Amino acid sequence: MSCFSGVLNQSDAFASLNRAWTTGSRPVGAVGLSETGKALVLHALYEQQKKPLLVLTPDEASAVKLTEDLRTLQGDVLLYPAREMNFVQVAGASHEYELLRLDVLSRMAAGAYTAVVAPVAAACQLTMPPAELLERTRTVKVGDDVPPGQLVQALVAAGYVRHDQVDGTSQFALRGGILDIFPPGRTEPVRLEFWGDTIESMTAFDLATQRRTEALNSLRITPSAEVLFADAEKTAKAIEALAAGLRGKATKAREKLLTDADNLRKTGTLPCKDKYLPLVYQSNGLFDYCNGLLAVCDSAKVKEDNVIGTLEQGECVHVERPVTLQI
């Protein structure tokens, strides 16, 4: 136990807060805390309960600040950012925040975190459900027998893009018996060398020099896109149903929907996947991954300034899980 938790444990107010959580008397609240005080209370609760935290903040700036404060007190604190939804085809659209989010979701699904801090707008955005993420996640080890072609199919299904040579995240390249993969969350790509169908060696390597930097025994390959069409035919039919429901003068919209349905059948994917996200997943967003304490900082501001605005944009999800702590 840290010295900060030790001091807080001597406080009657904190003891009452901790007792309320333990006995299930929720929601509970703590008022009058400074920004640093919020981090200290959350850290002390984590140490007492030994359960991970999901903390919602009003905006990105407050999320970044709280993440930094918590990281000085405990390890494996993750920041879950909001991302810009792409509803039209945009050349060269950045996927930086999407990849950051996928890394956080993968670590939450694996239980490899102590706290996740998220602006409420980010937490309310639809995303891949845990079951789908785990189904698309694969771990390979040195000595495994797996045909390279089979692994390539799994990578494509998980949203990776094939290149002649890997030069960025979410890419892979296959040359003979060598398979290079750059999963989200890693700082360097990984090279798998095969002897037939057996993984003979596995090493991280530098993108610029192509030199090996670290020998690995295993690699966890996680999805590289939040929207994956597991059943392209089913989604195509749902898009066609939307088109059939359009009436009046919505000719162009109907044509666009039918074109997307046709392209999805032919290629298995679409360049503007986000607009069909509600057809692909039944999701409560980040809340589906929460199995510990849910805390809200500045709860009144979160509700007024963010949730209403997100609802107006049609991006918010309905969550029945009760807030357990308001600070």
Language-model regions, residue ranges each:
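ASCE RecA-like P-loop NTPase motor cores
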Residues: 1-327
